[in-house]
Amino acid sequence: MMGRPGSGKGTQGKMLAKKLGCEIYSSGNRMREMARGHGFVAEKIKKVIDSGGLLPNWFSSHLFVEVLLGLAPDDTIVFEGACRRLHEAQAFDETAAWLERPYKAIFLNIPDEEVERRIAERKGVEGRADDASDTVERRIREYDEHTAHAIEFFRQKGVLVEVSGLDTIENVHQRVVEALSL
């Protein structure tokens, strides 16, 4: 599940996991969980998250590769917010190929104006540190500079499923389900 900040990755990922009866792995949630810990690494992670930045390629890749390696051959999982950089997308694809695991990358597409509106709305509800207005601008830049390349990689591999995220939560979910032929 990929998309701009506020595109609904978490919400749609949870709904898809429920429909499939499987687990969901959220890169953002995992990193926020790690940032709540104690010690040097937790502080470094917290600093990056609070600034709206991305952790190093190797770090993010290590986390989702570890999850992939722990799955049984018939297990299904939804990854939400993974592969935010080209190197991560390539590592995911290489790992999935080695494990003989087919996959689809779902891209929830929304424009930048909608990102700002949704995050402003979410900020009052969830209170995430990475939803501060200056941080949102940086997250949009990070998306444009990095995540867009990962999405293009998946498009060229023929595994990208693009869905408009501009509708009600239920209608977007229905589009995701239809796009995946579920």
Residue ranges and their predicted role:
Residues 1-182:
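Glycine-rich phosphate-binding loop of ATP-dependent small-molecule kinases
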